[in-house]
């Protein structure tokens, strides 16, 4: 929750954090919206003659690029799910996208555990805002709920954290 931040970080979060939405496209933390339940993958062809990915792709990508330019950001830190991030036209993003993966060791094998991943994405977003992180190196210091930095997967620009 945005309210878990120190008040002096509200402006920074409002400037830097974006939330992808199936209904609203792209949101800032303090945008006022009505509660809703609509997944990006919901079949909307009969309603809007398009799926939500196609409907939002150009607007969301254009808005993100404008905000990246206005904020002077060097990276786009992607903490969204693959489902939601596929709404972005990656070829049109003007900076390098940094992805995150959180895996848990179970029976000598690393696995993604859905609810843990959601919690860790939120924790990482808070860590980035709390520390005003705008480069890759400080992200490696993230340690929450036994998750710690493992390595960078260069082929996908992914920072892997394991527990």
Question: Which residue ranges define each predicted feature?
Answer:
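Internal, well-folded beta-alpha domain core
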Residues: 2-155
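Short, basic/aromatic-enriched C-terminal tail that caps enzymatic domains
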Residues: 156-163
